[in-house]
Swiss-Prot record:
Disruption phenotype: Severe developmental abnormalities of vegetative organs and impaired reproductive organ formation. Chromosomal fusion in mother pollen cells. Increased telomere length and frequency of anaphase bridges containing telomeric repeat DNA. Residues 529-588 form the HTH myb-type domain. This is Telomere-binding protein 1. GO terms for biological process: regulation of telomere maintenance. Residues 263-272 have a biased composition (Polar residues). The lineage of its organism: Eukaryota, Viridiplantae, Streptophyta, Embryophyta, Tracheophyta. InterPro entries: Homeodomain-like_sf, Myb_dom, SANT/Myb, TRP_plant, Ubiquitin-like_dom, Ubiquitin-like_domsf. Residues 351-430 form the Ubiquitin-like domain. Ubiquitous. The gene is TBP1.
């Protein structure tokens, strides 16, 4: 009975019958058998056909055997094949010229491969004996393939394994319906006796049973259109190759390649028994095919691009563009690594230091008032030159700490290449005499300056910094060329200097009484380590302030400064102005609300009177500067 084609299967072949389920058994470990050197049912059939065709070639005429009709060669049109009632699936690929070793194709056009292994057949002795008997019958009777056997069924159909179409089967092998060989075979078949034909049919049935009892390793093949030629090549490398020249009708039947990679064989023996109607269903649905195709694409991509061998490795990019930002970051990182490697490779331990300025010790210069500015510059220059000629001692400060041990290396002291060198400071200190005080240089040991240089000589004293060496905190450093320095208050000295005084340059006139004390200059840089000391006004200073305001007024604070506090440098005119406002406020409130040092009430009354008087004078003059008058008491 011929199965009808189903819409869901199309030209994919037969629908396999439902196989009844068997009780689940314990899993049994099956040993994998060697695939090489195995002989399968298809090889057995090819061997039988080889012997049959060899005997037939000897009987037939030689020159007309290998002729091929020109119409078939030119047209190559597909012809529907015959479908068998109980056919077994065949897995095949296109026959190549290089792979046709051991393949014998007769005048009927049957093509096959000879496998060189018979291990699978050796395991089944009954199957081997049956095969031998069939081969003997086929050898003795070359025309054993009768018309009514399983090969010569005339039921028209199309094998749907995706290989295209197979021409119609004749009585002996495969023949084209229009060929003259088919007519000759039919006439020979009709001329045979009935007994011989029945014997041949029985031998063919035995061969069919032998083939179906073997477990053929079948796999789904690629699809091909129904209009394709017989012998469609399904492998890429097989395209462009012609079939073996011994194939008469140019019919290429598919068979497995004989290499180790694609060889398929009888790995496990068949357990179907006598169930001749069962055909394994190896054609999956669309989902399985799509999944299989996606896995193939993924495997090919991994093979090209590289797989991840471990979690730490990165998957190599294959024909993918890297973003510009990421590429720039990687280039910058590589440059930094190269620079770091270059610096690390250098074995130089040189330390580069930049000295911008030195801190020199404090200089105390005494010069009379009638001296000129040029004489002052000359005196300072001579004093500094004398100190330098005498000798200086360089001190090193690292992060505010003095390094006293001269035997330490720079690395031991913390001065190396990799650290910041901005915290290193240098100081210049005077060398003291052996017989003198540590902070005094004896005048007899110094060079003298002529008396004609200045009108009255100056006294210059060189002192060393304090013991802690904290950047001359007790004796702050100075810059002699700093124009924004602040002078210390002048101290009037009435004592006569002697030969054992702290003078570098001796006096020209030892009877001089009025000497100017020129203090050390300060830099403009703010010293955050020092704060201005708060010095409250005393009663005497308040009395001087009130007296000056009574004579000069409340709007002339600079004049008040030079009149009453000229020699007091820690009192500025701003301090005097603020103190006057405080005194006015203190005098206007009750005594219980006053805070701070007590001020006599008499002075507070004078403050209120002077404030009222000068306010009235400014109102009368309408903004004109007030005339200095003595406030009436």
């Amino acid at each position: 009975m011929v199965l009808q084609k189903r819409l869901d299967y199309g030209s994919h072949g037969h629908r396999a019958p439902i196989k009844p389920r068997v009780a689940t058994l314990a899993p049994v470990k099956r040993s994998t058998r060697i695939r090489k050197k195995q002989m399968y049912a298809l090889d057995l059939l090819a061997t039988a056909a080889e012997k049959l065709l060899a005997d037939q070639d000897n009987l037939s005429s030689g020159p007309n055997i290998n002729e091929t009709p020109e119409g078939y060669v030119t047209s190559m049109k597909p012809v529907k094949a015959e479908q068998f009632d109980e056919a077994f699936p065949l897995r095949s690929v296109a026959v190549k010229k290089d792979d046709c070793k051991g393949c014998t194709v007769g005048c009927a056009g049957i093509c096959g491969f000879l496998r060189q292994a018979n291990m699978c057949l050796a395991e089944n002795s009954s199957t081997q004996n049956l095969a031998d008997s069939v081969l003997e019958s086929l050898t003795a009777k070359p025309d054993v393939l009768a018309k009514d056997s399983f090969v010569s069924s005339k039921k028209s159909c199309r094998l749907g394994f995706g290989l295209g179409t197979i021409p119609e089967y004749g009585s002996v092998g495969v023949c084209q319906p229009w060929s003259t060989r088919s007519a000759e075979v039919k006439q020979v078949h009709r001329a045979r006796p009935t007994a011989i034909r029945s014997q041949e049919d029985s031998d063919a049935a035995a061969l069919c049973a032998l083939v179906e009892t073997m477990d053929l390793d079948t796999k789904p093949l690629a699809e091909a259109s129904s209009g394709s030629n017989s012998g469609v090549h399904i492998c890429g490398p097989d395209r462009g190759h012609n079939s073996h020249p011994s194939c008469l009708a140019k019919v290429q039947h598919a068979a497995d390649r004989d290499d180790d990679e694609n060889s398929s064989g009888c790995v496990h023996p068949s357990t179907s028994g006598n169930n001749r109607g069962y055909i394994p269903h190896y054609i999956g649905d669309r989902r399985i095919r799509r999944l299989f195709a996606s896995r193939l694409r993924k495997a090919a991509r991994n093979r090209i691009c590289g797989e991840m061998s471990c979690k730490g490795n990165k998957l190599s990019l294959c024909e993918k563009k890297m973003p510009t930002t990421r590429r720039r970051v990687q280039q910058t990182t590589l440059k930094r690594k190269r620079l770091a490697q270059l610096y690390s490779e250098k074995s130089s331990d040189e330390v580069k230091l930049t000295i911008k300025s030195f801190n020199i010790p404090e200089l105390l210069i005494e010069i009379p008032e009638n001296a000129t500015v040029g004489s002052l510059k000359k005196t300072v220059s001579d004093a500094v030159t004398t100190i330098i000629e005498r000798g200086l001692r360089v001190g090193i400060l690292l992060q505010g700490k003095n390094i006293q041990n001269d035997n330490k290396t720079l690395r031991q002291a913390g001065i190396c290449r990799g650290k910041k060198l901005n915290d290193i400071g240098f100081t210049l200190e005077c060398e003291a005499g052996q017989d003198s005080h540590p902070g005094v240089i004896v005048p007899e040991e110094m060079d003298f300056v002529g008396a004609s240089v200045v009108d009255k000589s100056a006294t210059v004293k060189c002192e060393e910094p304090a013991e802690n060496q904290q950047l001359m905190q007790d004796f702050p450093g100075c810059s002699l060329s700093d124009p924004g320095s602040v002078d210390y208050p002048v101290e009037w000295s009435t004592q006569e200097t002697s030969a054992s005084s702290q003078a570098i340059v001796p006096f020209a006139d030892p009877n001089s009484l009025a000497l100017a004390n020129v203090p050390l200059s300060r830099s403009k840089r703010p010293d955050f380590g020092q704060r201005r000391i708060r010095r409250p006004f005393t009663v005497a200073e308040v009395e001087l302030l009130v007296e000056a305001v009574e004579h000069l007024g409340t709007g002339r604070w600079r004049d008040v400064k030079f009149r009453a506090f000229e020699n007091v440098h820690h009192r500025t005119y701003v301090d005097l102005k603020d103190k006057w406002k405080t005194l006015v406020h203190t005098a206007s409130i009750a005594p219980q609300q006053r805070r701070g040092a007590p001020v006599p009430q008499e002075l507070l009354d004078r403050v209120l009177a002077a404030q009222a008087y000068w306010s009235e004078q400014q109102a009368k003059l309408h903004g004109d500067p007030p005339v200095p008058e003595i406030c009436p008491t």
